[in-house]
Amino acid sequence: MASECGDTAHVSEAPGRLTIVGLGGSLRAASHSRAALEVALAGAEEAGAETRLLDLRELALPMFDPEHESPAGAAAELVETCYAADGMLWSSPLYQGTVSGAFKNSLDWLHILGSREPPYLHDRS
């Protein structure tokens, strides 16, 4: 199944193999949205992709502060892993009709990718 938070390397073991990163946006221990994401990642793996799960409960991201855009620790892991992915699967519970605060915070951290070339998650599926 998908590897979890840890190493940020993108290079696939097999040339031509896609790397799919799943971003799980629930802080709940028994998360239904994370369970659905794990099923989707398993399907991607069965189709030949290398997969990685970024579980926001385990990642424990600090709040994004736009005045301090140099990520370290968990934030750097999130940013580098997402940028290196060939494709992403996102899953979040809905609270008050929108994504969880933890999920939104993770997307805020990806703002840092705007200064890269190509910017953000451009050309990712």
Model-derived regions, located:
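Helix-loop-strand module that forms the ligand-binding subsite of alpha/beta enzymes
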Residues: 3, 71-125
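Short secondary-structure boundary/capping segments
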Residues: 12, 43, 53, 79-80, ...
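N-terminal beta1-alpha1 ligand-phosphate binding loop
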Residues: 12-49
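Short beta-strand segments at enzyme active-site cores
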Residues: 52-55, 90-92
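N-terminal beta-loop-helix "entrance" segment that forms/cooperates
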Residues: 53-73
